[in-house]
Amino acid sequence: MKEWIVTEENNLKDFTDSHDPQASFFFDRLLKAREIKINGERVAAGGSRTLLKSGDRVCYYLTRAQEEMTAFDTVYEDENLLVTDKADGVNAEAVYETLARERGAQGVNFIHRLARITRGLMIFAKNAACAEELKRAFKERDVEKTYLAVMKNCFSADETRQTAYLAKDAARAEVRVSGKPSAGAEKIVTGFQPILKKGDIAVCEVFLHTGKTHQIRAHAAFLGHPVLGDTKYGDKALNKKYGKTRQCLIAKKITLRFSGDSPLAYADGRTFVSRYGFEEYGALPV
């Protein structure tokens, strides 16, 4: 049995995500089966946002198979950097909280987020100086991020760089993409390179030249090539055809770029690669 004592007000889903990566895999299933208890009382099937108060006791059971599933792996670590490879369905905050608990006073610094429904690489700093340098590098686009996506049809050219404009729709928790500038919209630039085509889908490398909320998924859908399995911006018929309810998107590679006077200069040019691929479509991990 997993048991947690709440120390500050939160809702059930966010609390579970931030405390137990394993439960992130199975939260919906546990909730539907009413296997989560708060202070000994079973939570209703629709109670993911149940408010928790300090002192509340949350408990649930995971099977041995569920316990053994890997929420994330550490793929690289030195005195300054830590790189993890997380599974889809795992909240990024849960990865951070787990690392922080394991390392105690040594700790880690949260640098960037990765959506719960996206698999792949996350990088953490292990001290304040390197955290500041990494945050600067991400902000100034000195960190090169490459994604792998399964998309509808994809592009005829070997590689294409596309420009559009993205505006947030806070009321609907989504974004809108258009081909022309508009009030409140920001310019986005995304590169797409098909590496494998199979019928009406293709596996593509995707390069973020700007980094905005939902940029890859929304931009791809705007161009008529939605990401397979995307339930927000995707093609419902295509998702149903392939039986996909989770987006086929992986944060595949991270390449670091630092100048000679940087505390991370030794890592300049270093590339990290996720173990995940789309083997079912012939795109193996590289």
Residue ranges and their predicted role:
Residues A164, I188-T190, A202, H214, ...:
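Short beta-strand segments
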Residues M1-R172, K197, Y281:
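RNA pseudouridine synthases
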Residues G199, C204-F207:
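Short histidine-centered loop motifs in beta-beta connectors
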Residues M1-L30, S182, Q215-V286:
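Pseudouridine synthases involved in rRNA/tRNA modification
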Residues R172-E174, K187, Y233-L238:
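Short Pro/Gly-enriched beta-strand edge/turn motifs at strand-loop
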Residues R161, D169-A171, K180-I195:
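Non-catalytic RNA-recognition surface used by pseudouridine synthases
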